[in-house]
Amino acid sequence: QNRNLFRGSETFMIKFRGAYEVISGLQAGYANNNYTEFGVESSINFPNFLFPFVSSDFKRKIRATTEFGLQYNYQMRPEFLRTMASASWSYKWTQRQKIQHRIDLINIAFLYLPRISERFKEDYINKGQNDIFQYNYQDRLIINMGYSYNYNSVGGAIVNNTIASNSYSIRFNFESAGNIMYALSKMTGIRKNANNEYAILGIPYAQYIK
């Protein structure tokens, strides 16, 4: 971690992780019983609000931090080979020491499965008993944005290490994915694929609100 990357109090962080395991109890039909995973996660945090065409006065008032992030994850299992890559852009700021805001301006993630064993397809995916389960084992593009609000009545007491009685907190989260892409697909007359899904460059994209 570097806390002054460009001499402006920026914070750069990078993490690596890995795992290896021999899976026992697998049924016949799989090439091996090895599980390997590794990943890397990096982010850079700027102590100010970065956005084009925004006045300096607005940036001073909001006092937000800006974070850009990149992630990559690789999973090789007997059942499948799966990779995930993502890039994100977000803002965070605190209001009156009690309220925390976070805006995920955009997060783009790509889930890719170049290999799924035939045994795994037959035993789980092709049975069609769980649509969500099938969804998690398909190539997918996820473009989402979101907002979170966190109110803590203790506020500054946490900073000052004092004890507050009858404290409470309120949390609110909103996340939306694919709805803008869906509207553009409808407007431009893009046809759905064989699975009745809209796609970008042949890759289906996720659509939800939560």
Per-segment meaning from a language model:
Residues M13, A19, L26-K210:
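Transmembrane beta-strand segments of outer-membrane beta-barrel domains in Gram-negative
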Residues N2-T11, N33-Y35:
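Membrane-proximal, glycine/serine-rich, low-complexity loop/turn segments characteristic
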Residues R7, I23-G25:
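Short small-residue beta-strand/loop micro-motif enriched in glycine and branched aliphatics
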